[in-house]
UniProtKB/Swiss-Prot annotation:
It catalyses: an N-acyl-L-aspartate + H2O = a carboxylate + L-aspartate. Binds 1 zinc ion per subunit. It is an enzyme of class 3 (hydrolase). It comes from Prochlorococcus marinus (strain MIT 9312). The keyword ATP-binding does not apply. This is Probable aspartoacylase. Keywords: Hydrolase, Metal-binding, Zinc. Transmembrane segments: none annotated. InterPro entries: AspA/AstE_fam, Aspartoacylase, AstE_AspA_cat, Aste_AspA_hybrid_dom. Belongs to the AspA/AstE family. Aspartoacylase subfamily. Pfam families: AstE_AspA_cat, AstE_AspA_hybrid. One of its GO terms (cellular component) is cytosol.
Amino acid sequence: MTVQRILIVAGTHGNEINPIWAVKQFNRNENSLKHGIEYEYIIGNPIAYEKGCRYIDADLNRSFKKSKNYDQNENSFYEISRANFLVDQFGINGSKPCQIAIDLHTTTANMGTSIVMYGRRFKDFCLAALLQNKFGLPIYLHEKDKSQTGFLVEAWPCGLVIEIGAVAQNFYDPKIINRFLIIISSLRDEIDKLKKNLIELPKDLVVHVHQGSVDYPRDEKGDIDGLIHPKRINRDWKMIKKGDPLFLNSQGIIYKYDGDQFIWPVFIGEVAYKEKQIAMSYTNKEVICSKNEWVQEFHRL
């Protein structure tokens, strides 16, 4: 294995301030090189962080797009320019190349500490399996959603999001900060153990696979006309079956789940997703058998 540099990104969203505090604290107290692996730290969206807002022109974590109809160089949005800078600096062909990107986020939803993956790259599965085995973290595998693309970690050969909540935007929570510190502190140790064949991946990886999202109930003007049902609040990762309540509108009407399949909701009531018309996303649970190819590809980084 030749993994040498890991990019740790905090503040991809400027009002998610706990990861920034955690990274600054870790950088003061820890050596930059351990097990032959060096961390590179960066605030993803420094201007938004200074202003205390999620972004300036566009969501930075949707700005790493590659398509024939999307020209990164001609877009005037600040976040597009920032995405180009991050890739030029820290991308695999950048001036300070990193093989792995870890993007640290907080959420107002009651997600606990979780891992977010985008797609089914073997290297990502390997890294996610290491962390799930160490900490027992749930994994949200985000795929099949063409309206949500351009995620930061997809611009690197390997990458994951660490998502922790619930915590309000622009509010420091020492418990949240400590969780980030534990994961950052342990990441290189787990990679080193794998490199030295001191640990193996678990036989199975449990993931919650994205199936879609649902908006709040709305009136004829398009305004929100319903709230998350009291029985659904703070129930991320908890199974929903047919007939379970989802929303309660202003007339007292209960909106129930009418699907035949069990689903597991995530990001329930996430404040930042209102603009995306998402009240919650829903997933199916999938058990994936670990593969030797995961480790083999990770070794090639």
